């Protein structure tokens, strides 16, 4: 099944963006070629941009603390797997400690590094990081891959508590939902939300159907409409029934 996810609020939207960026960063950092490490570095700049939202750190700390207080009373409950519970609580407490230790403005260490700041300013220009534009950057790209990885890992380290916190919140949200099999009649589906507040919607479709879901929602109702791509990859509305799995997630 192909999984599509749709955030219901700006906070989850930001966390999904961070998750995607960190996954891309990790992939390219593990590669060998200097061009791949260039992508890792520019992705690091994107992470800092998204993570620099003023209230992101405090939002994550509040959510983790709320979840910790919800789970902590289950300690000693014979109906709960205690090892799993302690692992989750320990992960939360460790991540909260990491967030607490973050000092100053998020990503400020990148702005304070003049060399990185020069690369960042040139990277937004198409073709702006050529060797004649940034000879010192080109020289760094000629160093051993292990050295480049070590440098980039050092630059990402102050942002890792945000990655860990986002991963916990998204995991808890995803695990809260229960998938149900539904049918989009003539490619369209809608459902009343009965006043419940959700943070995330998941849509799973069989790859052989070759359909793409488009979703929208408000606090009363959600809509899912399916399209297919024509020869030019432009979306075209589906007029046949489409089976899919729907999961609504609420923290």
UniProtKB/Swiss-Prot annotation:
Top-level taxon: Bacteria
Alphabetical list of Pfam families matching this protein: ZapD (PF07072)
Subcellular location: Cytoplasm
Chief location: cytoplasm
Gene Ontology biological-process annotations: division septum assembly; FtsZ-dependent cytokinesis
SUPFAM superfamilies named in the record: YacF-like
Cellular component per GO, a single term: cell division site
Keywords: Cell cycle, Cell division, Cytoplasm, Septation
InterPro entries for the chain: ZapD, ZapD_C, ZapD_sf
PANTHER family for this protein: CELL DIVISION PROTEIN ZAPD
HAMAP family the UniProt entry points to: ZapD (MF_01092)
Function text: Cell division factor that enhances FtsZ-ring assembly. Directly interacts with FtsZ and promotes bundling of FtsZ protofilaments, with a reduction in FtsZ GTPase activity.
Subunit-structure text: Interacts with FtsZ.
Family membership: Belongs to the ZapD family.
UniProt name for this protein: Cell division protein ZapD
The gene coding this protein: zapD
């Amino acid at each position: 099944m192909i999984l599509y996810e749709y955030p219901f609020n700006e906070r989850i939207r930001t966390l999904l963006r961070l998750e995607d960026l960190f996954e891309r960063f990790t992939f390219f950092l593990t590669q060998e070629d200097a061009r791949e490490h260039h992508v890792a570095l520019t992705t690091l700049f994107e992470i800092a941009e998204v993570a620099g939202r003023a209230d992101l750190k405090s939002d994550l700390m509040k959510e983790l603390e709320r979840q910790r207080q919800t789970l902590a009373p289950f300690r000693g409950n014979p109906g709960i797997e205690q090892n799993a519970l302690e692992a989750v609580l320990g992960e939360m407490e460790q991540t909260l400690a990491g967030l607490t230790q973050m000092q100053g403005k998020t990503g400020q260490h990148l702005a304070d590094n003049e060399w990185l700041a020069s690369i960042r300013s040139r990277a937004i220009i198409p073709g702006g990081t050529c060797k004649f534009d940034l000879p010192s950057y080109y020289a760094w790209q000629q160093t051993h891959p292990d050295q480049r990885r070590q440098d980039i890992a050092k630059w990402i380290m102050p942002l890792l508590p945000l990655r860990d916190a986002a991963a916990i919140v998204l995991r808890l949200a995803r695990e809260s939902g229960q998938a149900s099999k539904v049918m989009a009649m003539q490619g369209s589906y809608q459902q009343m939300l009965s006043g419940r507040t959700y943070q995330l919607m998941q849509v799973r479709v069989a790859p052989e159907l070759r359909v793409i879901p488009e979703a929208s929602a408000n606090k009363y109702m959600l809509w899912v409409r399916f399209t297919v791509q024509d020869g030019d990859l432009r979306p075209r509305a589906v007029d046949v029934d489409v089976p899919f799995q729907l999961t609504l997630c609420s923290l």
